[in-house]
Amino acid sequence: YYKEGPFILLNHTGMLDDCFTCAHEAGHSIHTTLANANQPVATADYTIFVAEIASTFNEQLLLDHLLSKTTDKETRLVLLQSAIDGLIATFYRQTLFADYEYQAHKLVEEGKPVTVDVLSSIMKDLYLEYYGIDLNNEPYKEYVWAYIPHFFHSPFYVYQYATCYASSLQIYDMVKNNVPGALDNYLNMLKAGGSDYPVEIVKKGG
């Protein structure tokens, strides 16, 4: 795998989501290619805290390209709605889930009982706080925690989606607006692989 080049596996059906998935995965591939080319095998691999920056950067690049190429009102609305949905799902929803995870683990640390009702109550409170949505009117949604595998197999993983997304938009904005050194900083961040602490690597990107 190291120095052999990444592979993208994608069932492309010609839908808009497929195009964005392709751009997303290409971001990971570019990241891997640059890291492998500039780092020894011991520090080429990067963490999730950095990984989703390149992928979402590419999604934003594709979005801007498509918006610049179409004047059709309905197509533009679909593209903008897709971007809004992505923002909600990647930033706000994942932040809510991270908050939920913290509160659930805190119960265990404090020796308090952890039951289905307690866990669902936390989710209901957070949906009301984050979205103003009363889950009493949406039965079963309070159990969303039960089918999110990250909570059970990869604790404290989901917050990184939100941090990467925020970092990616900041870096993309600087590159798009031709801030001096922004593109080089971004590429150097990708080339860094896992050669430093994740936060320090992200700082290199801007």
Annotate each language-model stretch with its function.
Residues 39-46, 74, 110-113, 180-183:
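Short, surface-exposed loop/turn segments at secondary-structure junctions
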Residues 3-23:
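Short pre-active-site segment immediately N-terminal to the catalytic Zn-binding motif
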Residues 1-9, 80-96:
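Active-site-proximal, well-structured secondary-structure segments within enzyme catalytic domains
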Residues 22, 30, 68, 94-101, ...:
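C-terminal, non-catalytic "cap/extension" segments appended to globular domains
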Residues 19-30, 49-50, 54, 61, ...:
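Internal glycine-rich alpha/beta core junctions
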Residues 35, 45-74, 83-85, 89, ...:
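Post-HExxH zinc-binding segment in Zn-dependent metallohydrolases
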Residues 13, 17, 42-49, 87, ...:
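Short, solvent-exposed segments of well-ordered alpha helices
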Residues 27-41:
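Catalytic Zn2+-binding segment of zinc metalloproteases
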